[in-house]
């Protein structure tokens, strides 16, 4: 048995957040039988956890008292190959009819995985690494069920195109099968020595199964499906159990399995690359949609800004018109101010001239007052002299008085 763990299968889970029902992986071979992964997106017992289990694919085909002792573990990865979670290793557990499944009921909290793959298109991969340590083969009773199945197939679906059969070494085969059956007996003459059934219909159907197995294994590995390979394995086991000596065909099956694994690995790689390309294309498509949305928002914003700019230009034009009117008013007031200032200067000049004239008149009046006072003094002295004179002096006095009166009248005219 193997001593090294090997990656036996990669199961891709898509739209994880929407999944609730259990998912079974395709079967894969290891340790002489097929296995499959059973994945519970919402847990086998608790909705808050993921559950992962490993089971034999068809335990009834393994016979009675079969056993497989195996170690295995699971790895969860995102689409980029980054490890999200690795389970502990389950070691030395026996799988048998009483224990058909082993695994992890609480592999990982569901919410934790959802958070990790939120930005990874809601998908991830599950890998299983297995090492079968010990195999206990089961034994089979006469496979009546398989024989009955062949009989039913023969009775329910008879070949209408060929009715003629040819006997080759006790097997009645169709004429189209003669060449192939002859070659088998030529290369392996003891192939049917231990075949136990005497029913000719059953023998014919078993030979048809053998030819179908050989035909399938003759295909190119990349054109064989996993289901076909699994069927070949089961049918080869059944043929061996009813007495066909097929060690040479088992060796050929091992070669086909190796070639199939290689082709499948290459195919998985291509599939992963195709998935990656699809993911990238989806991402580009999503980004394009997002970009179109942003472009629409940006266009709307530009239009809004253009409308605002247009409104501001209109408002600016109005303000300019108002400013032009205010400027005209200012210039008019400035001209009026200048005119008034000139008029004021003129009036000030006139006022200065009048003040000078008044001052001159005041000075003349002052002089007249002084002269009048002097005259009064003179008159007082004259009066005293007149009193001492005789009437013969009246004429002189009259003459002097007349002169004073004339001067007074002259001053009055000036005033």
Curated annotation (Swiss-Prot):
The entry's keywords: Coiled coil
Pfam families named among the record's database cross-references: MATH_2
Keyword match Coiled coil: yes
PROSITE patterns, per database record: MATH
Domain of life: Eukaryota
InterPro entries, A to Z: MATH-CC_domain_protein, MATH/TRAF_dom, TRAF-like
Residue ranges that the Swiss-Prot or TrEMBL entry lists as coiled coil: 244-341
Name of the molecule in the record: MATH domain and coiled-coil domain-containing protein At2g42465
């Amino acid at each position: 048995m193997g001593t090294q763990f090997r990656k036996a299968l990669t199961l891709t889970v898509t739209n994880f957040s929407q999944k609730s029902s259990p998912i079974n992986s395709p079967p894969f071979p290891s340790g002489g039988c097929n296995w499959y992964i059973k994945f519970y997106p919402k847990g086998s017992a608790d909705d808050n956890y993921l559950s992962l289990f490993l089971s034999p694919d068809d335990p009834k085909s393994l016979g009675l008292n079969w056993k497989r002792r195996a170690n295995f573990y699971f790895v969860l990865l995102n689409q980029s190959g980054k490890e999200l979670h690795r389970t502990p290793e389950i070691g030395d557990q026996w799988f048998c009819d009483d224990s058909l499944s082993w695994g992890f009921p609480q592999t990982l909290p569901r919410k934790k995985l959802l958070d990790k793959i939120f930005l990874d298109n809601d998908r991830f991969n599950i890998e299983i690494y297995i090492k079968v340590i010990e195999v206990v083969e089961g034994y089979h009773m006469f496979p009546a069920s398989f024989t009955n199945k062949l009989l039913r197939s023969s009775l329910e679906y008879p070949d209408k195109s060929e009715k003629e059969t040819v006997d080759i070494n006790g097997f009645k085969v169709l004429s189209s099968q003669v060449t192939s059956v002859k070659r088998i007996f030529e290369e392996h003459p003891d192939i049917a020595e231990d075949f136990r059934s005497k029913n000719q219909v059953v023998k014919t159907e078993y030979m048809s199964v053998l030819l179908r197995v050989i035909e399938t294994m003759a295909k190119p590995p990349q054109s064989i499906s996993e289901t076909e390979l699994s069927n070949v394995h089961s049918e080869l086991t059944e043929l061996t159990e009813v007495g066909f000596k097929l060690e040479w065909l088992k060796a050929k099956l091992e070669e086909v399995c190796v070639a199939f694994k290689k082709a499948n690995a290459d195919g998985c790689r291509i599939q992963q690359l195709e998935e990656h390309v699809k993911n990238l294309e989806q991402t580009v498509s999503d980004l394009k949609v997002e970009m179109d949305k942003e472009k629409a928002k940006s266009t709307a914003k530009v239009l809004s800004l253009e409308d605002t700019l247009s409104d501001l230009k209109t408002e600016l034009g109005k303000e300019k018109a108002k400013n032009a009117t205010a400027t005209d008013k200012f210039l008019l007031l400035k001209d009026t101010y200048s005119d008034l200032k000139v008029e004021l200067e003129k009036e000030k000049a006139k006022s200065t001239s009048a003040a000078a004239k008044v001052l001159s008149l005041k000075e003349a009046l002052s002089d007249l007052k002084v002269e009048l006072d002097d005259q009064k003094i003179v008159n007082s002295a004259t009066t005293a002299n007149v009193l001492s004179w005789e009437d013969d002096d009246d004429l002189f006095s009259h003459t002097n008085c007349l002169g004073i009166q004339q001067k007074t009248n002259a001053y009055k005219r000036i005033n």
